[in-house]
Amino acid sequence: GEKLGYLPGDMKDKVDPYMQPLYDALNDFLPGKQAAKLIEEKRIEIAPLAFMRGRTLANAFVVLDEAQNATTMQMKMFLTRLGEGSRMVVTGDRTQIDLPRGVPSGLRDAERLLNSIPSISFNYFTSKDVVRHPLVAAIIEAYEADDPPT
């Protein structure tokens, strides 16, 4: 992950810019200040991947976003936090990996290692699934035509 130590402010100030896409999505789905209220009540928690170490996430719905940039060890650490009564969703785009050269994507490794486990499924989206601006689908298709996904 990104280095947070050099950013100004307390930990919340440091991580909030990275969490903004999640706040945006919550605000799209929950009316008014409902998202803020649920976060304040700790019924919804948004935390950096590094904060998951040592935890067990029981009776929870857990989302790891942008997982293409998790290392293999980060992915293993995250997936092994699964507690009783919980579900996990891991999202990521294999075409947007920006880890340093030679560092494998934990998302790709998880696909390879876990695809035969019956209770784990992988779902893949195409440009037809884009819900952003219509041009985004065309942009994705142009990049795919130039360099097909692996």
Language model feature labels by segment:
Residues 1-64, 68-150:
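Conserved helicase motor core of SF1/SF2 NTP-dependent helicases
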